[in-house]
Amino acid sequence: MQTKVLCQRDIKRILSVVGRDVMMDRLISEVHAGFARLGRGETDEPPPRTGFARGGDVPGVIEFMPHRASGIGVTMKTVSYSPQNFERFNLPTIVGTVSRLDDDSGSMVALADAATITAMRTGAVAAVATRLLARPGSTTLALIGAGAQAVTQAHALSRVLPLERILISDIKAEHAESFAGRVAFLELPVEVTDAATAMATADVLCTVTSVPVGGGPVVPAEPRQAHLHVNGIGADEQGKTELPKALLDDAFICVDHPGQARAEGEFQQLPDRELGPSLADLCAAPEIAAPHPERLSVFDSTGSAFADHIALDVLLGFADELGLGHKMSIESTPEDVLDPYSL
């Protein structure tokens, strides 16, 4: 069986021809529909991700994120989080690949670069949570962290909110200053500020930082708007948190992956608190979210392999429409399947 391979060139072509707005809108729609199915019990929650922590002079993690859709296939993302990549290697902080295995034969039917769609699906998932939990008509978005993930957070949230301005804060001034150029396509004013001002001013706030383990919080608990909605995105490994516990204590909290939430993410700080409704629960029953847009809410995002599965579906769909990707014989198909040397 041949494998369809989508490389950076193919993904760039999809974004160019289809347009990033259309692709992001499709992702938001499919993520919402998919998580609603998950909340209704029509598909299974993926297992928690696993992997290796890398210490020493080049810290980071390499993780494996699987999801199986029965009768369709298994999506497997291998992803690396390496916070020194930009300075040391001029590479993105998050790099990886995502593959699709046929559910019956186990053969790899697709393989794609995962850096862009990981950033886009993370934004799309946050947009779904924000649409459910943020005050309708929210106009001010604040971002703590001005890296690659901040770009897709701003893009995705601009598709579900009538944003009028973006506040950006980063401990690296050059990243904050360059952010406006990277999101110029949004045609929104961008103001560089500090974390406390961003927190006090925002209707919606996203934390997307590379804060080290034990280095949080990256924002103060107060002052803030009474209706503030927070998307906590960057707490993606054990011991890493971005939000102050005092903020979490006062908030309605929704998690993306209940099986992961206590090992990673902000819920690490709340060992005695019961998990509330998940994002899947809210998508399946939006009335659960209805009381919360006027009060403090937090979406605790650790990253879901189910969202990766959906994102790969969207990517493959656009690739098929445009005739993109190359078929390659990556896997062994010997002339005699009983003889591994008969290649």
Swiss-Prot record:
EC number of the protein: 4.3.1.28
Cystine bridges: none
Enzymatic class: lyase
InterPro entries: NAD(P)-bd_dom_sf (IPR036291), ODC_Mu_crystall (IPR003462), ODC_N (IPR023401)
Pfam annotation, one family: OCD_Mu_crystall
GO molecular function ontology, one term from the record: lyase activity
Mutant lacking the gene: phenotype: Cells do not produce significant amounts of rapamycin. Cells supplemented by L-pipecolate restore levels of rapamycin.
Catalytic activity: L-lysine = L-pipecolate + NH4(+)
A single GO cellular-component term on record: cytoplasm
Keywords: Antibiotic biosynthesis, Lyase, NAD
Family (UniProt): Belongs to the ornithine cyclodeaminase/mu-crystallin family.
Function: Converts L-lysine to L-pipecolate, which is incorporated into multiple secondary metabolite products, including rapamycin, tobulysin, virginiamycin and pristinamycin.
PANTHER family per UniProt: KETIMINE REDUCTASE MU-CRYSTALLIN
Name by which UniProt lists this protein: L-lysine cyclodeaminase
Species for this entry: Streptomyces rapamycinicus (strain ATCC 29253 / DSM 41530 / NRRL 5491 / AYB-994)
